[in-house]
Structure formats: structure tokens, C-alpha cells
UniProtKB/Swiss-Prot annotation:
This is Large ribosomal subunit protein bL19. GO terms for biological process: translation. One of its GO terms (molecular function) is structural constituent of ribosome. The keyword S-adenosyl-L-methionine does not apply. Belongs to the bacterial ribosomal protein bL19 family. Keywords: Ribonucleoprotein, Ribosomal protein. It comes from the Bacteria. NCBIfam families: rplS_bact (TIGR01024).
């Protein structure tokens, strides 16, 4: 990578990101702008993928809201996310959990790792 680009992106990287992987349940505190006001909206769900590296790294969180699956993709180092909390650590054997989209109810559960 170009040293100039690398030095610019290093200043943008966040250091307060917890360690989480696909299968973990996270609570994302996202900043939402409505008109002139800004508020925090909490989005809690299972991380189904994590891709990219460095400043362009992204993760996708899936939750079931009123019986409908909702997925949101966030950049890891965005200032639009106030904080990320890991609620539960899950044990999975895949890096991408897209198969959870087809499952519902108890079949979509993920085994928990006790820490």
C-alpha cells in the first residue's frame, strides 16, 4: 500500500472496537440524524459476516423484528457508530453465516460460548 494512503487511514482507525466474530450477538449503538436532531438507535443481533480489512472493514448484523428478518451492514471504523457491545459469544464453524437467512425459530439458534 502507498505510504501516503497508509498514513492517512491510520489516523481514521478506531481503537475502541471490541473483539467480535461471526456468530456473536452484538449491540450496535448507531447515531441517527433526523432533521436537525441526532439520536442513538440500538440495533442488537447476530453478526453473520465480517469482510474487508483496515479502514474498509465491514460487518453485517441480523435480527428478527416483528417476525421479519432485518440486516444492517456497518463499517467498523465509522464515526456513525457510537459503540459496539458484545452481548454473547457464539460458537460457529463458518466465517459467513448466510444460511441463517433460511432458518427460523429454534433452528436459527447459535450455541453460546461461556467466558
Amino acid at each position: 500500500m502507498n505510504p501516503l494512503i497508509q498514513s492517512l487511514t491510520e489516523g481514521q482507525l478506531r481503537t475502541d472496537i471490541p473483539s467480535f466474530r461471526p456468530g456473536d450477538t452484538v449491540r450496535v449503538h448507531a447515531k441517527v440524524v433526523e432533521g436537525t436532531r441526532e439520536r442513538i438507535q440500538i440495533f442488537e443481533g447476530v453478526v453473520i459476516s465480517r469482510k474487508g480489512q483496515g479502514i474498509s472493514e465491514m460487518y453485517t448484523v441480523r435480527k428478527i423484528s416483528s417476525g421479519i428478518g432485518v440486516e444492517r451492514t456497518f463499517p467498523i471504523h465509522t464515526p456513525r457508530v457510537d459503540k459496539i457491545e458484545v452481548v454473547r459469544y457464539g460458537k460457529v464453524r463458518r466465517a459467513k453465516l448466510y444460511y441463517l437467512r433460511a432458518l427460523q425459530g429454534k433452528a436459527a439458534r447459535i450455541k453460546e460460548i461461556r467466558k
